[in-house]
Amino acid sequence: MRNILLCENMTKVQKEVRCDHCGTSQGSKSVFSGQKVFLGRKITDVLETITHRSIPSSLPIKICFVCTSTFMSSAALIEKVRETVDRVQEQPAKKTKVAEIEEPSTQESDKKAVKVPKKNTTLRQRSKSIAAFPPSFVNGANTNTEIEIISASPKKLDKTPKKQISRLFEDNLNDSVKLTPAKEVSSTKKAFLNLFGNGGNDAIEVLTESEEEEDSDKGPITINTNNFQCPECEFHAKFPKPYKEHLQKEHGLQRPRIYPCTLCIKTFGVLKTLKNHLRDTHSRTFESEAKTKAKESKEKEAKSGAKNKIDAKAKETNAVSQRKKPKEKKSKEKKTEIKCNVETKVVDEIDDQVNNKKGTDSEDADQTQATKIASFKALNESLMKKRMLENVIDSEYTFAINGSSASTPRADSNNFQCEICDCELMTAKQMQEHMKTVHSIDKPKVFKCHVCEKSLATKQSLKTHMTLHADGAEAPNSSKRKILQDEDEDVDILGTTQIENTAEKVEGPKKSQQSPTKAAKFTNRKILQEEDEVVEIVDAFKTDNTAEDDEGPAEEKIIRSRNNIQHQVDGGMIAPRSPAKKTKKTSHVDLSVSTTNGNSPAKSEKRKKQDKSEDTLPSSDVDIVEEINYNVRPHKKARLESIGDSTADESTLSCDRCGKFVKSRQRLDSHMEKKHAAKLQCTLCKEVYQNQMDYVAHFSNCGSEGGLPCGVANCKKVFTEANFLSSHLRKRH
């Protein structure tokens, strides 16, 4: 029981809250916070009316019920006092209005007593409203009040010029007009003021000033972009970048705006935005100070040059006129007239010359521009025709392909179409992303051959593939690209080759040709490489017309074959390869020489010919031969691509582990090295796996808290999920 009572007392103590105003502690229900409403008003609003301060709504104030009731009564008292003060302040204003109404009535009573001649009816129309007041109100006014009202009326009339003018007319003027304009005359009353001869000059001046302002507004705005002064310190910079860095580092401005607009308050951080702002909002152009200075200097030079020319012409004419002067004296007036006429004539002549020059220059410029435009048009027409022909494919068009029944077929569109969902996209990159995201194909083959409909992954591979079709169309009987296996032996072909030939290797009859004169002939070295079969080398040498050498230039045919006897060729010049084909591996070349005479020549004769040809070779050819790299090997990637593209009677090979089919032995070796040669060793359990799937699957039993490491020796990557690891092993290793 004691414990229960203690708990109840504790709860009572906790619920009691202390008042901030009177300090008494009461229950939480009888205490009001700042947000609570008492008799339709918040406690904070009541405190603001009493203290005349702005009190935040989140003020942690607590007031008891008694204090809040006293605050409410004091707030009501303050509001009542305000109302009485406002009511008292409004009463004097009403009395002054009554005084203003009484003033014209007293003046009218005085005017009735004294006989006054008639006034202008137009000026007395304002005083007709006085008849509305009773006569007792007018007669009962005291003289003292009249004097006070009259003395006080001009002070109020200063604020209203219309009333002041009317009162002055009624009091002081008889059949006369006096104008007292206000400080600023409105535009609507300028015409009325001009009737009396005043304000005309002002209006003209205003118009001229406005016109000048409009003319000045149309010109470009010049801003100095090479002088930046910090307004907060003495920092000075010539370029914007260091000035921005200074404002960011020293003054803490995150985005400093260093280009202010001279026509408004806005500032900009980039000069381009300032130019756009001036163009769009103010319809003005921007010019730097350097450009304006250059323009001004050019204008000054042009003006000074024109003045100098005019002065020189005037001096010349004066000298001529002085020589041709008659002896008779003329009056000063005639002399001045002659001088003026001469100067005007000189100016007219200069203007005519300038106009003639401009006309001739403009005609020449028009002629040159016309020729240029004609040439440009011709070039553009030829280029457009070429582009149109390039867009049209050589294959036969049908209306069914284009999907139209028009009389003229259209060129195929360059859009890429998905074979799965028939989606058309503009670029190859978009199609690749579409195939990856929508159809989940890792390596999409987007480029398609229009001849054999083979799909390829890159544009370069499509080009190399198209060369195969082009080679097949040009030479259908020639065999396709052959892979030459011996890489270390190079074929060097020169115009002067040393060949050991016998009578058994002669293939054709000798052709006898005689040189008609002893004149020297040009050495022409033509190396013609046919489609992987025949290379013809034609050498025309300088020969002497002797009994021993009656033979003309020899034509040598070098035929590549596998079964003939191999001869190593000495020399240094390699036969150029066609640019469309890829680099091929060089190997042994079997040579069979067809000489130009009836019998096979002796070795001594050939050696003599060789010595002569070497003597006749120019020094430039020798230098070129010496600079040639004889041991050129194709790049590994190009070699592998040529191996992969070759289809010359190759049997397909298959991998004994995964069953993949390849077309060459080197492809199979590279596949074995990449996929099956690497051993995967787990860094956690130290087990070795040959298969990638087994290695990834063993992590279900092995602890994978620290991640899934790549099992390759030199690879240190770690992955969080198994699919990431498997894709890494499949693509990289």
UniProtKB/Swiss-Prot annotation:
What SMART domains does the annotation carry? ZnF_C2H2 (SM00355)
Q: Does this entry carry the keyword Acetylation?
A: no
Q: Which GO terms describe its cellular component?
A: nucleolus; nucleus
- Its domain of life? Eukaryota
Please give the Gene3D superfamilies that the UniProt record associates with this protein. Answer: Classic Zinc Finger
Gene Ontology BP terms: maintenance of rDNA; negative regulation of transcription by RNA polymerase II; positive regulation of transcription by RNA polymerase II; regulation of transcription by RNA polymerase II
Q: What else is known?
A: Named after the Hindu god Indra who lost immortality due to a curse from Durvasa, likely referring to mutants displaying a loss of germline immortality.
Q: What is this protein called?
A: Zinc finger protein indra
